[in-house]
Amino acid sequence: GDDNKYFEKIGKTITDITNEIPFEIPATWQWVRLDDICSYIQRGKSPKYSPIKKYPVIAQKCNQWAGFCIDKAQFIDPNSLPSYAEERLLQDGDLMWNSTGLGTLGRMAIYKSALNPYELAVADSHVTVIRPLKAYVLSQYLYYYFASDTVQSVIEDKSAGSTKQKELSTTTVKNYLVPIPPYRKQQRIVEKIKTVTSIMRG
């Protein structure tokens, strides 16, 4: 906006959100609420577990900074599958954000069906599933932003509850402001980070 101020328009209401903006961005970028660039943001649901290894449920321990790990998953009772709406079935590119407890809160991974040998997977109630609108934003770009110190250093402040039971509410996730560059720029940023990361790993 003018004079270095940022405004948000919802319907006819215009609000000054300058104090929410963590840093300046180039003119071709936009600050947007996560909910405006996603088709689905929702906590998973509490599963009914089963020893039958058919439908894995993604818990916080499956989401590591090293990546998504299906090996740590437990399984839901196959008979409970009809209680899951279709949108709750994880899709390629879904971001899975750990939303409960100190030490795990804020950790994120990207769901990849190629790493899941089973037919499908769902998330448990400690994981928030974020489904980006792929025409506008890359999952990998959002992942790198949320993994950055900019977000991770303040994530506990944005959560509620006692120290041991910190909770990142769905409302907080939906309202999170994200700096979005043009699509081609997102692609270049992702490629650059991948290159640097692979060099660092040597």
Summary of predicted features, one role per range:
Residues 15-44, 175, 183-191, 196-202:
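Non-catalytic DNA-recognition/assembly elements of restriction-modification systems
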Residues 136-140, 187:
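Short, conserved charged micro-motifs
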Residues 119-128, 155, 160-180:
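A short glycine-rich beta-alpha junction/loop motif
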Residues 20-25, 82, 128-134, 174-180:
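Short, well-ordered beta-strand elements within core beta-sheets of diverse protein domains
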Residues 10-20, 35-48, 61-97, 112:
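Sequence-specific dsDNA recognition surfaces
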Residues 1-13:
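Extended, domain-scale alpha-helical bundle/helix-rich regions
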Residues 64-76, 95-123, 139-144, 153-159:
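Short, ligand-facing micro-motifs at secondary-structure edges
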Residues 60, 152, 165, 186-187:
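Glutamine-centric residue-chemistry signal
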